[in-house]
Amino acid sequence: MDHNTIVAAALGLLEGLTEFIPVSSTGHVLLAGHFLGFDSPGRAFEVLIQLGAIMAILGVYAGRLWRIFSSAPQDPRARRFILAVLLAFLPAVVIGVLAHRIIKEVLFETPTLIAVMLIVGGVVLLFVDRMANRPRHFSAEDFPLPMALKIGFIQCLAMIPGVSRSGATIVGALLLGADKRSAAEFSFFLSMPTMLGAFVYDLYKNRDILDAAATGNIVIGFVCAFLAAVVVVRGLLNYVSTYGYGLFAWWRIAVGVAVLLALQAGW
């Protein structure tokens, strides 16, 4: 097993472990690839291993998704929840399409920017986690439509490298009155259309740089991401209900500081 295969597996595990927690999976994968010197198809590899995480959450929530969609014709609550997720997804579609090129040109995915945003996001998450002690919404399926739309706009901050999609949506939900469990759960549901849409778009944009030589490493990364994400999705809700998001906030800060020190040392 060569170096690239081992690193592909490690990056897949890292993607799966971090995709649904508020620490920025993309930031972690890009930083790990940078420091490990991974010779991969770059963005194409990152996009395709994210599909493993997407499949994991679809698998874990398959039963609940079936219940929601099958009952929607008769159940106003199910219809309202589907509409809430679609409303929250809408800002990412509009802003992503209109501003994608500008964002890519202005906000380069450099290790320094990612590290700084990890620290900033960690401080914000720590503050919000400690102040969110009077929730008004306790079920992701009952979030009001205006609240869902606001979460969708906040999610767009994740277009800045290192911010974290799940981190932005969780912080947004907490600020708008969700309890810690329902904030994470709504982030899960919102990730499905958001990540699928981003996957299709990025796959199309990167179709010319995929090659057969990289297929083996991509498959390994995909499988590792899927398995790790299943574990995280199954355990995260119970964890945050009991302990909150403080651990993830301090992790972001620690990783960001460590990366800045490493870069300063010339790594």
UniProtKB/Swiss-Prot annotation:
GO terms under biological process: cell wall organization; peptidoglycan biosynthetic process; regulation of cell shape; response to antibiotic
A GO-annotated cellular component: plasma membrane
Ranges that cross the membrane: 5-25, 45-65, 82-102, 108-128, 143-163, 183-203, 213-233, 243-263
Main location: membrane
Residues annotated as signal peptide: none
Keyword presence, Hydrolase: yes
Subcellular location: Cell inner membrane
Enzyme Commission number(s) from the entry: 3.6.1.27
Catalytic activity: di-trans,octa-cis-undecaprenyl diphosphate + H2O = di-trans,octa-cis-undecaprenyl phosphate + phosphate + H(+)
Membrane topology, as annotated: Multi-pass membrane protein
A molecular-function term among this protein's GO annotations: undecaprenyl-diphosphatase activity
Keywords from the named record: Antibiotic resistance, Cell inner membrane, Cell membrane, Cell shape, Cell wall biogenesis/degradation, Hydrolase, Membrane, Peptidoglycan synthesis, Transmembrane, Transmembrane helix
Keyword presence, Hydrolase: yes
Family under the similarity heading: Belongs to the UppP family.
Leftover remarks: Bacitracin is thought to be involved in the inhibition of peptidoglycan synthesis by sequestering undecaprenyl diphosphate, thereby reducing the pool of lipid carrier available.
Function of the protein: Catalyzes the dephosphorylation of undecaprenyl diphosphate (UPP). Confers resistance to bacitracin.
Designated name of the protein: Undecaprenyl-diphosphatase
Gene symbol of the encoding locus: uppP
